[in-house]
Amino acid sequence: MKHKVKRIHFVGIGGAGMSGIAEVLANLGFMVSGSDLGENAATRRLAALGVQVRVGHAAENVAGADAVVISTAVRNDNPEVVAARSRHVPIVPRAQMLAELMRLKHGIAIAGTHGKTTTTSLVASILAEGGMDPTFVIGGKLNAAGANARLGKGDFLVAEADESDASFLLLTPVISVITNIDADHMDTYGHDFARLKQAFVDFLQHLPFYGVAVLCEDDPHVRSIMPLVSKQVVRYGLSESANIRAENVRAEGGRMLFDVVRTNGSVSRLPIELNLPGVHNVLNALAAIAVATEVQVPDAAIIKALAEFRGVGRRFQRYGEVALRDAEGTPQGSCTLIDDYGHHPVEMAATLAAARGAFPGRRLVLAFQPHRYTRTRDCFEDFVKVLSTVDALLLAEVYAAGEAPVVAADGRSLARAIRVAGKVEPVFVEDIDEMPATVLAAVRDGDVVITMGAGSIGAVPGKLASSEELV
């Protein structure tokens, strides 16, 4: 039956989750096409691989397609979806297509509210270093590979498992990781945290009888579901009760050094030098080490992969030093520029703590764009708290991501609440296009500047770090 499917069309092909699956399918030999509202690095990469990419959505784009893949961001009234439905062309959710790919391999699925992309990238890097040539589909660009997806010849497929729309319940991996569980995407679960936790339990129950659940012992919500899991469980974390734990954790020049103690009948120790900052990344690395241990990657490969890990796009991505000049063009020193995808208060706090550890004593300037009005509303007080910890704050208007505005959950309301809290004086930037100039006007020599958010602020660091401004 599968041989009947020759051409697969993606609506919104430039998205992080969609482009990776499209690339793997193209490399498997399928004719792949897609459309998006604009070009980006992902669409250009796909076009170079021979994928037909069109800018704009139109009914004629799906002509000749045997299947149409959509993400949850695509509306039912999209002209391509309407055309596919009228022609009785199967409309396939993105997660279902990922599940089909996972059936061809031994799946390793990384779930959790925070840390999925980094952990997935670490697992893929370790397996690659161990000679296992994995297939991977990641939500961000793996810098060492220059892409967010790759078709490998090995037995394993490593992918993120997305809980935001409960689509991770479609996956059938042999190893499942849960990094943490936090209150996010609560609309999907009727604003019921118990339902969210149950979804993670159900995700683990999809493991086969020989499968393994790799769970973070340090996260209280993950720990609370462990008694409900009827599969083999490997616990990782800093806790003494973890099967795979880190000891002697210390920060050194933007890297984390620690010893891994593995307890599984016998005890073994592994010295690790992780080329990422922050204790949260130590936990991500422990999850990856747990997976690598299960699939018997040699210790030498684990050590080498973590020491040489080159990071993931928009996850504490370092752009280097940006030259500062006054109005007359006179050099005024430089600032360090970092970009991060963080958009939930918990992950933002972890990133800011990592920055403090990597650059002790330096002034921290944050340019932040909130993502979604509903998240801003639901996490309002937590946003006020975490945003008040920086030395200077440039706050953009909320990136709607298709949502209608919510009263008292916009950027101005957030800026007002932060101002009332009294720890930092925010500068509100209504137009994101004005953010680069606002940043350059606010920074001083020696500052560390972090651009952060999941929306259009992702274009800001590139404008700041243009070739003539880098030193």
UniProtKB/Swiss-Prot annotation:
Subcellular localization(s) per the UniProt record: Cytoplasm
Keyword annotations: ATP-binding, Cell cycle, Cell division, Cell shape, Cell wall biogenesis/degradation, Cytoplasm, Ligase, Nucleotide-binding, Peptidoglycan synthesis
Main location: cytoplasm
GO MF annotation: an example: UDP-N-acetylmuramate-L-alanine ligase activity
InterPro entries xref list: Mur-like_cat_sf, Mur_ligase_C, Mur_ligase_C_dom_sf, Mur_ligase_cen, Mur_ligase_N, MurCDEF_pg_biosynth, UDP-N-AcMur_Ala_ligase_MurC
SUPFAM superfamilies per record: MurCD N-terminal domain, MurD-like peptide ligases, catalytic domain, MurD-like peptide ligases, peptide-binding domain
Reaction it catalyzes: UDP-N-acetyl-alpha-D-muramate + L-alanine + ATP = UDP-N-acetyl-alpha-D-muramoyl-L-alanine + ADP + phosphate + H(+)
Highest taxon listed in the record's lineage: Bacteria
EC assignment: 6.3.2.8
GO process terms (BP): cell division; cell wall organization; peptidoglycan biosynthetic process; regulation of cell shape
Binding-site residues, ATP: G112, T113, H114, G115, K116, T117, T118
GO cellular component: cytoplasm
Pathway annotation from the record: Cell wall biogenesis; peptidoglycan biosynthesis
Function: Cell wall formation.
Record family assignment: Belongs to the MurCDEF family.
NCBIfam families: murC
Name of this protein: UDP-N-acetylmuramate--L-alanine ligase
Organism expressing this protein natively: Aromatoleum aromaticum (strain DSM 19018 / LMG 30748 / EbN1)
Lineage: Bacteria, Pseudomonadati, Pseudomonadota, Betaproteobacteria, Rhodocyclales
